UniProtKB/Swiss-Prot annotation:
UniProt keyword terms in alphabetical order: Cell membrane, Membrane, Transmembrane, Transmembrane helix, Transport
GO cellular component: plasma membrane
Record-stated family: Belongs to the binding-protein-dependent transport system permease family. CysTW subfamily.
Gene Ontology biological-process annotations: transmembrane transport
The name this protein goes by in its record: Putative uncharacterized protein HI_1475
Domain annotation ABC transmembrane type-1: ranges: 1-112
Subcellular location: Cell membrane
Organismal lineage: Bacteria, Pseudomonadati, Pseudomonadota, Gammaproteobacteria, Pasteurellales
């Protein structure tokens, strides 16, 4: 969540305040301004920030290892599964988990490119 908060704060701070003030003159509440004006205008950067935050979070290996440890079936994420299976000698499962990580990363990059190309 911290990964996404920095990007989201930057997105909304760069939002032109004239739109916000115009919505206030039309008697929209701040919540309705957010829902009806700001989010529709900033949906692409918000989706990109969320996808990037999710891709960073899925690759968090060091923090998981330091805080939760490497416990099979309890704190096992995909990067942790690669680590645990390589250390136990199950290379086929480690390669499978690595291929899943590559597939997920490729899908995320494809989604980002499709969003950036859409006008």
């Amino acid at each position: 969540m911290v990964f996404n908060m920095r990007s989201t704060r930057g997105i909304f701070s760069s939002f032109e305040s004239g739109y916000r003030f115009a919505s206030y003159t039309l008697e929209l509440s701040p919540f309705k301004t957010l829902i009806k004006i700001e989010i529709p205008m900033c949906w692409k950067p918000l989706v990109c920030a969320s996808v990037l935050a999710w891709s960073r979070a899925i690759g968090e290996f060091g923090a998981t290892l330091m805080l939760a440890g490497a416990t099979r079936f309890k704190t096992e994420t995909l990067p942790m599964a690669v680590y645990l299976n390589i250390s136990s000698g199950d290379f086929e499962i480690a390669i499978g988990a690595s291929l899943w990580l590559l597939f997920i990363s490729s899908c995320l990059l494809l989604v980002l490119r499709m969003i950036n190309r859409a006008v």
